[in-house]
Swiss-Prot record:
Residues 1-69 are annotated as: Disordered. One of its GO terms (biological process) is RNA processing. This is Uncharacterized tRNA/rRNA methyltransferase Mb3610c. It comes from Mycobacterium bovis (strain ATCC BAA-935 / AF2122/97). The keyword Methyltransferase applies.
Length: 322
């Protein structure tokens, strides 16, 4: 009855007390943090795109000191006409002959290059099924000079004139620069061992035979090699559109090494810092820049023109300036 009821509040039976709630301690929330954006499909191991990427054959990276194989009738014929050194000419049996193929075989025979006939399937395997048109030319690795030997040979014919390439990537530019070095009395070319165009069949063809006369050396560290050359009395001049010295003001009568930067980025920071001066080519306002090989040719031509003039004694030059 109301007022005298002895009923107590609800009592939980013993052994059934819920107790204090226990959470995850934030583990679930923290587990979702810091994962960043979802990676691309080809980087997720179990995604079909990743499986397809793993199934694709990977082409090995070609090293600069490996044998090169030139494929196709026109490229092979150009190499043979340019006198590119080769060890073997491969011709697939049953290949339809034309004037190019006939000339390739004749030039290879005249040059003492081995002519090897093989099944087309074997040539397919040898060239990884590239479009070889039934013919391939094997070119051995280029025999690079040592930087010290290159400098010593140049100093024996003073004043030395060398060209260093700072991560130039196009072998056609390398070949064109070799051609300019030969045309304007230079003694050789220096390239980095890594991240640089090497003397391939493409460079050899572009050089128009200059590769047979102009030595090319490879430096493990281009900056350190240039420092060593500077210590031996060679002046290092960099070539850059933003250079502080105009080409007209450069004294080209001393022993020089002209450093040409890469096609896109120009001179690297360390190489630029170690140049005695950075030279620019005066151009018309409408022209923004020159191709690397063209710029190198312009500078080499200017230096050669200075060296053809009789050198005045320093005293006469100073008296005229006074």
């Amino acid at each position: 009855m109301p007022g005298n009821s002895r009923r107590r509040g609800a009592v939980r039976k013993s052994g059934t007390k819920k107790g204090a709630g226990v959470g995850s301690g934030g583990q679930r929330r923290r587990g979702l943090e810091g994962r960043g954006p979802t990676p691309p499909a080809h980087l997720r191991p179990h995604h079909p795109a990743a499986k397809r990427a793993r199934a694709q054959p990977r082409r090995p990276v070609k090293r600069a000191d490996e044998t090169e194989t030139v494929l196709g009738r026109n490229p092979v014929l150009e190499c043979l006409r340019a006198g590119v050194p080769a060890t073997a000419l491969y011709v697939a049996l049953g290949t339809e002959a034309d004037e190019r193929l006939t000339e390739c075989v004749a030039r290879a025979a005249d040059s003492g290059i081995a002519i090897v006939e093989l099944l087309r399937a074997d040539l397919d395997r040898m060239t990884a099924n590239h479009l070889h048109q039934g013919i391939a030319l094997q070119v051995p690795p280029y025999n690079y000079a040592h930087p010290d030997d290159l400098l010593a040979a140049a100093l024996d014919q003073p004043p030395a004139l060398l060209v260093a390439l700072d991560n130039l990537s196009d072998p056609r530019n390398l070949g064109a620069i070799m051609r300019s070095v030969a045309a304007f009395g230079g003694h050789g070319v220096l390239i980095p061992q890594r991240r640089s165009a090497s003397v391939t069949a493409v460079a050899w063809r572009t050089s128009a035979g200059a590769a047979a006369r102009i030595p090319v050396a490879r430096a493990t560290n281009l900056t350190r090699t240039l420092k060593g050359w500077a210590d031996r009395g060679v002046r290092v001049i960099g070539l850059d559109a933003g250079g502080g010295t105009a080409l007209d003001d450069v004294d080209g009568t001393d022993s020089l090494v002209v450093v040409v930067g890469s096609e896109g980025k120009g001179l690297s920071r360390l190489v630029r810092q170690n140049c005695d001066e950075v030279v620019s080519i005066p151009m018309a306002a409408q022209a923004e820049s020159l191709n690397a090989s063209v710029a190198a040719g312009v500078v080499l031509a200017a230096i050669a023109r200075q060296r053809r003039r009789p050198r005045e004694p320093r005293e006469q030059t100073q008296n005229r300036m006074i």
